[in-house]
Design a protein with these regions (language model features):
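Active-site-proximal cap/lid insertion segments
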Residues: 1-146, 151-154, 158-177
Length: 177
């Protein structure tokens, strides 16, 4: 789940900019249920700064973006990274390195968010893969791999940019693969 904090040993894999954009990333939802168009799980408009490893600016909604959850206790202050409009410019700051990224193109900014999300998500999931691998290796080492059943369960996975989404609110085929 959010916020995809990966172990430092994974910082050099799945670099932003190397992950292919899904063909449905800019889905307009024309042939989908109304819920698909109304869903609040769009990479371009619904991710918070922490999701992307970015510094959240201080201030109100005009400066820092809309709260992720309105009407919730004041302790939860996560703000959505704004969706860039065609006549705007935005600068965001990497929380890890302090690097500034400036955008004036909404499409490029949405793709930047996708790359940041995917990089962080895949690095985090790599730890799960490695952990399961260690269990299987231990079973081999102990010589009990042939008479041991390993059952791994989870709910459906996150969308990885398909239809422009992150999260797992819909059970579309992509979130099961």
């Amino acid at each position: 789940h959010r916020n995809w904090q990966y172990h430092p040993r994974y910082k050099d894999i799945h670099k932003p900019g190397t992950i292919p954009l899904p063909g449905t990333f800019e889905d307009k939802y024309d042939n989908r249920a109304a819920a698909a168009a109304a869903a609040k799980m769009r990479i371009k408009s619904d991710m918070v700064y922490e999701d992307l490893g970015l510094v959240q600016p201080e201030g109100g909604a005009d400066l820092a973006g809309q709260r992720m959850l309105n009407g919730v206790s004041d302790w939860y202050q996560a703000r959505k990274v704004p969706e860039l409009k065609s006549d705007e410019t935005i600068t965001v700051i990497c929380a890890e390195t302090g690097e500034n990224f400036t955008f004036d193109d909404p499409k490029a900014f949405a793709e930047f968010k996708y790359q940041r999300y995917m990089s962080r998500y895949l690095r985090t999931v790599q730890a799960v893969d490695d952990g399961v691998g260690k269990i299987l290796d231990t079973l081999d080492t102990l010589g009990i791999n042939q008479n041991t059943i390993v059952i791994y369960t989870s709910d459906q996975g996150f969308f990885l940019g398909e239809h422009g989404w992150f999260d797992k609110r819909f059970m579309y085929e992509e979130s099961f693969q």
